[in-house]
A protein has these predicted regions:
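Extreme N-terminal leader/targeting regions
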Residues: 1-56, 166-167, 172
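A short, structured surface patch at a secondary-structure boundary
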Residues: 13-15, 24, 50-172, 182
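Charged, glycine-enriched surface loops/patches
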Residues: 167-193
Length: 193
């Protein structure tokens, strides 16, 4: 039983991944009552966000993982963030995610990192940073989006540090999340924590 996500498998190898963005964070899950009270504020806030950006701001972010050649129903991409497989190029700014990719022998897909070589825990990627085959593309609010475009990044895996862990951090972290959602959506690069 997973604490942070749910997986649903469908025909043709399509998978829906639902990620809970409230567990172990200061973000509060919406309830029916709070939804009614905050409807006007949220409506004003959501008018600033467009399409995919809104999907990243919800309590649950839904990713539809689509194998090469599979076709999804028209309009479904308005309700989910589509990740097309195979992913050939990834930006990783999470040490935990990087270690998992290393154990799965998938670090060859990493073309940009959100950590400098002295912070990188994977030897092959430290060497790749040194020889220039992997780019340091900044981290968190200092991400170099031009470097991500140049590396033809197909997905960004961010640290959960982008989410607030204490009540005092909530507004600043929500603004960082909103800014990231806007920029990644503009570049059409799906991101997850």
């Amino acid at each position: 039983h997973a604490k942070y996500f749910k997986l649903y498998h469908y025909a043709k190898g399509i998978t829906l991944l639902e990620v809970d963005m409230t567990t172990d964070t200061a973000r509060k899950p919406e309830t029916v009552d709070s939804g009614k009270e905050n409807a006007k504020t949220e409506a004003a806030d959501s008018q600033e966000l467009t399409g995919t950006e809104k999907l990243y701001m919800g309590n649950v972010v839904k990713y539809l993982i689509v194998p090469e050649g599979a076709v999804i129903p028209a309009g479904l991409d308005k309700d989910v963030i589509v990740i097309n497989q195979p992913v050939e190029s990834a930006y990783v700014a999470s040490t935990d995610a990087l270690n998992i990719l290393d154990k799965l022998d998938l670090t060859d897909k990493v073309t940009a990192l959100g950590m400098e070589k002295e912070d990188c825990t994977v030897d092959s990627l430290t060497a790749a940073l040194e020889d220039g085959s992997v780019t340091f593309a900044g981290k968190d609010e200092d991400t170099d989006y031009k470097a991500l475009v140049k590396s033809q990044c197909g997905i960004s895996i961010l640290s959960s540090d982008i989410l607030p862990t204490e009540e005092a951090d909530t507004e600043a972290k929500e603004n960082l999340l909103k800014d990231s959602a806007e920029k990644y959506s503009t570049l059409k690069i799906p991101f997850c924590r």
